[in-house]
């Protein structure tokens, strides 16, 4: 990453030593030697080495050696981040790393940098302190506002589930039509003598089975599966129903033929 960073930078800008890279180190090397970003020509490099926009104000860019990278990476949501940067610039007017007069130093709990030479020796650490405090306070303010906005909405939303819960039992009981009721109702699956209870069919199921039997008294397995899916029955139930229906049909035809035979013999001379 670092080699790609240096090579791309030196290829784009021939006078690379004029633009020294910032010092990314630990906290101990925070006050080390680094080039002031405010002293660099902002008009000559509008974009960073890898294409990020670095055209920011001098006061915010010189706040800390993390300021240039952090603000340029956050440059695309400009509307959401502008109040945070404005607060940072208004709290500390940083003209150069040597003199750091802070107007709101007491409010942030830090000393003015012009008080002692030891404070002047560490300008980067104090300026980083201010920006971090500003960012923390700016990020906490929207969270508090969001929590205050969400609390009344939650209070309003609480009565609604109660209303829906009262209406839920009414909606859970569907309307039962007469053709949906079973003709032979037996809640237990065993009959009075311990045998399996008679299968109860609804009027709709019986009507559909009677229509199918009217067209064809014998079913193929494919047609039986289709009827089972359509009527929410099992193949075994449909097979047994057709067997019983054929027996009934045979009995009816036998009685009809016998009655016709007796009627015909009665009219014989």
Swiss-Prot record:
GO BP of this protein: anterior/posterior pattern specification; embryonic skeletal system development; embryonic skeletal system morphogenesis; endothelial cell differentiation; positive regulation of transcription by RNA polymerase II; regulation of DNA-templated transcription
Function, as annotated: Sequence-specific transcription factor which is part of a developmental regulatory system that provides cells with specific positional identities on the anterior-posterior axis.
Record-given protein name: Homeobox protein Hox-B5
Compositionally biased residues, Polar residues: 113-130, 163-173
Location (main, coarse): nucleus
SMART domains assigned: HOX
Low complexity: compositionally biased ranges: 89-103, 136-158
Residue window of motif Antp-type hexapeptide: 176-181
Protein family per UniProt: Belongs to the Antp homeobox family.
Record has S-adenosyl-L-methionine as a keyword: no
PANTHER family for this protein: HOMEOBOX PROTEIN HOX, HOMEOBOX PROTEIN HOX-B5
Keywords: Developmental protein, DNA-binding, Homeobox, Nucleus, Transcription, Transcription regulation
Disulphide bridges: none
UniProt GO MF annotations: DNA binding; DNA-binding transcription activator activity, RNA polymerase II-specific; DNA-binding transcription factor activity; RNA polymerase II cis-regulatory region sequence-specific DNA binding
Cell compartment(s), UniProt: Nucleus
The species this protein was found in: Mus musculus (Mouse)
Any one Gene Ontology cellular component term annotated for this protein: nucleus
Top-level taxon in the UniProt lineage: Eukaryota
Tissue specificity: Expressed in a broad spectrum of tissues.
Region called Disordered, residue ranges: 75-173
DNA-binding region: 194-253
A Pfam family it matches: Homeodomain
Spans traversing the lipid bilayer: none
The keyword Isomerase is annotated on this UniProt entry: no
UniProt xrefs under InterPro entries: Antp_homeobox, HD, HD_metazoa, Homeobox_antennapedia, Homeobox_Antennapedia_CS, Homeobox_CS, Homeodomain-like_sf
């Amino acid at each position: 990453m670092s080699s790609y960073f240096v090579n791309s930078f030196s290829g784009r800008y021939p006078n690379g030593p004029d633009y020294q890279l910032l010092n990314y180190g630990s906290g101990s090397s925070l006050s080390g030697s680094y080039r002031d970003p405010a002293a660099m020509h902002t008009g000559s490099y509008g974009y960073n080495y890898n294409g990020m926009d670095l055209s920011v104000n001098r006061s915010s860019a010189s706040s800390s050696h993390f300021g240039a990278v952090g603000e340029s990476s956050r440059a695309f949501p400009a509307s959401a981040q502008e109040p945070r940067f404005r607060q940072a610039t208004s709290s500390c007017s940083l003209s150069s790393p040597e003199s750091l007069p802070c107007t709101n130093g007491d409010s942030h709990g830090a000393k003015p940098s012009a008080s002692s030479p030891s404070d002047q020796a560490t300008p980067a650490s104090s300026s980083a302190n201010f920006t971090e405090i500003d960012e923390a306070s700016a990020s906490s303010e929207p969270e508090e506002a969001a929590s205050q906005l969400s609390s009344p909405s939650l209070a309003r939303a609480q009565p609604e589930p109660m209303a829906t819960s009262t209406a839920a039992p009414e909606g859970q009981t569907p309307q039962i039509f007469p053709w949906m009721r079973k003709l032979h109702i037996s809640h237990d699956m065993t009959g009075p003598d311990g045998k399996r209870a008679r299968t109860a069919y609804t009027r709709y199921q019986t009507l559909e089975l009677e229509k199918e039997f009217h067209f064809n008294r014998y079913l193929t397995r494919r047609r039986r599966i289709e009827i089972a899916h359509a009527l929410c029955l099992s193949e075994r139930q449909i097979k047994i129903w057709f067997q019983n229906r054929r027996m009934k049909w045979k009995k009816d035809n036998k009685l009809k033929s016998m009655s016709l035979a007796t009627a015909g013999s009665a009219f014989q001379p």
